[in-house]
Every structure is written in structure tokens, then in C-alpha cells.
Amino acid sequence: MQMQLNAKTVQGAFKAQRPRSVRGNVAVRAVAAPPKLVTKRSEEIFKEAQELLPGGVNSPVRAFRSVGGGPIVFDRVKGAYCWDVDGNKYIDYVGSWGPAICGHGNDEVNNALKAQIDKGTSFGAPCELENVLAKMVIDRVPSVEMVRFVSSGTEACLSVLRLMRAYTGREKVLKFTGCYHGHADSFLVKAGSGVITLGLPDSPGVPKSTAAATLTATYNNLDSVRELFAANKGEIAGVILEPVVGNSGFIVPTKEFLQGLREICTAEGAVLCFDEVMTGFRIAKGCAQEHFGITPDLTTMGKVIGGGMPVGAYGGKKEIMKMVAPAGPMYQAGTLSGNPMAMTAGIKTLEILGRPGAYEHLEKVTKRLIDGIMAAAKEHSHEITGGNISGMFGFFFCKGPVTCFEDALAADTAKFARFHRGMLEEGVYLAPSQFEAGFTSLAHSEADVDATIAAARRVFARI
């Protein structure tokens, strides 16, 4: 299904809403016009960027292709808020796509980074900070006995792909339709995130041989997994998945699904990897695997563990991790891996998250937010389904339930585009795609949430 909105759809989505009055003999309630959003400087900067950067951005979803209009160009962020170059202030539910769990520009994180700058930003050599953060990760994450730091979530995922193959001696890997594990070749087959947003089934440039080694099953459907294992007996190195999908929108697994995957992988001699780049340390102190009580063999991480700095990590059983060079034969390296700035920000972020009440706050404000948005939608007869786990949430404009990518395709993307624009006009910044999860932070207050719900109610009244 083509997910990119065409020009006609977008134009219709943003057509001025005239106040309702009496039409024929039917009285229709008048609706207040939306606030005027001035974006002149954003438009100027983006116009110049299109001559300098492919599509004017450095990551596709930022271009607002699926919601229409031009992207908002930011000037600064702090706490739960962001300000654009035109001076507009927004309550932010993107959070730099997940890392800003303590709030933007957290003072404790900033002070730690400022102190580290004077000592050095990159050594290209071991530093004790790597040990400190590694111990924190190992202490909290059930599956991790040893960890390797890298510089992005994509790097972490492509590394575990190679590791699964090296450990098992097999070539094929199984993933799930709509799950996104970065932009490595093997993961761009029926992927999520910006790949869905742009309406791309796959990406040009991926060799057919690579695509052939990537098997795709249906999320929350164990039969589809069993069928692929039966058809590829002894050939599947491992299974990788988002334990909570955040790159096809917000999709929650059943406990039976995750438990079934654990049992299948154990029986088939395949490696089970949870991609916790998004969920790691966000939905629980010990990540999604702690929340659901299912322990994978390998885990990828990112976002939160860098506290806003570029970072990634992968870890798991020592038996498997000792395959990684220089301990073993599977080669992987990185110039900025384990750099002191990322380690410093990660240490302070995990320290803050380890304090009493942190995850209770995330659950409280996020549940209040999603319940309020859905109630506001239903007040104005809009079909909606959604939910949250701790500081991660999402909703779809459809009846639901949404249990897999195929269900998500039923969502009304044109309505989401109108809603997104309306919320921007009301001073609320949501992810510019129906197919991305949203995030709250420790900096979000109940007042922020209530203001957001009130804004949603006004927008639902006029779309």
C-alpha cells in the first residue's frame, strides 16, 4: 500500500476550515479558526537546505513528507519544550526521537558534559567511563553479561546481524514486517520508520542476495515464524525484533508472542535478539525484556544510553559476545566508539533514571496523555486506538486493534496529517508521521499534558 501522501491529499488535509453555520435547514456548530502559525524563517532555511542536503534534511522523516507542509526548523530546546527559528514554542513529544528522556538540556547531564569537555571529547583509546557505563547496563539488563559500545543504533543492529551469523555459522536472519533496525542493507526489506513514511517497499541499492537472506514474518503471529523456520530448516541464524514496535507506530506484543519466539529460537538453535534501541531504559529500568519477563540472547541499545549524544550498544551472553574482536574472530570497530562524551551523558542519564519515582512519573504522565487524546477524539466521533507503556505511546486513526504492521495500514494517514498540522498550530510538536511512536520525559508535567489534551480537543473539533 502506498503510504506517501500525494499532493491532492495533502492539499485537502490543510484546506482552510471555514466556521460552520446554518446549511440549509441544519444548524452546525461554529468552530473557532486555528491560531496562525508563522514559519517564515523555517521556510527560508529549509529552502536553502534543499540545495545543500538531499531532500533538505539529514534523516528522511524530518522532511514532513507524510504530513505535508515544510518542516519546522528548531533553534533551541529545554525541558519538555522546543522553540523554532520563528520564535514559536511547542510542547515536545518527539524528544529527539527518544534520547531526551530526562528532558532536553537536563542541567545535571549538561554539567557533566561541560566538565568532560575540558578533559577531552574523544580519546581513541580506552577510558574508565566505558567501564562505568558498561557496569550500569550489565547490572540492569537481564540478557547482558558483556557489552560493546558503538556510535548509533544502526551500527549496533548491523553488528549483531554479523554476530548472529558468526556464532551460528548460518546466513539467514528473520525479522518482522514494519520493524525498523536501522538502514543496513539487510534491514531495509519491508522495514518501518521513514521507509514506511516515504511509501517505499524496500530500498534501491540492496543486493538481491542480501534480500534473499532476510526473511520477514508477521508481528504477533507465531505461525508465520514457525512456517519460515520449517521452510528454512537449519539455515536461520537468528530472529531480531522490536519488543515493542515504535517504527510502525506504537504496537504492543502479546506475552505469548515473545515467549513463543524464545521457545522457537531455543529449539531451533537460533539467536534471539531484542532491538531495544527505542525501548531500552525507556519502558522499564531493565528495558522491555524486564517488563515482559522474556530474556533474549542479544540486545541492541541506543538513544537513552547516550543522553542525547550519538551512541549505540549491543550486548548479551558472554559465550556469544566473546566472538567479537579482539576477543574473537568477528570483526567490528569504530573511531568514536565509547567516546567520553557519550559515556558521560549515558552515565548521568541512567543515574537519574535509577532514582525512585522516575518510571512511575513517566507512566503517570504518559497514560494521562494518551487517555486524554483518545477521549477527545471520541468526543468528536473520530475513530482512534492507542496506548502506552511507561514513557512511550502512540495512536492510530482507525477502529483497531492494531497488532501488526498490516493492521497499521488501515490508519487514516490523511486525518493524521490534519491533526498533526492542527497540533502544531496549537503549540504541540508530535512526530511528523502516523508510523512513529511518541515519547514523554521526566520534564513533562501534568500541566503540559492537560494543555496538550485541551489542544487536541480543539483540533478534533475542526478537522
UniProtKB/Swiss-Prot annotation:
Stored Pfam families: Aminotran_3
Keyword flag Isomerase: yes
SUPFAM superfamilies from the UniProt entry: PLP-dependent transferases (SSF53383)
Transmembrane segments: none
Keywords of the record: Chlorophyll biosynthesis, Chloroplast, Isomerase, Plastid, Porphyrin biosynthesis, Pyridoxal phosphate, Transit peptide
Subunit text: Homodimer.
Annotated protein name in UniProt: Glutamate-1-semialdehyde 2,1-aminomutase, chloroplastic
Lineage, uppermost ranks: Eukaryota, Viridiplantae, Chlorophyta, core chlorophytes, Chlorophyceae
Gene giving rise to this polypeptide: GSA
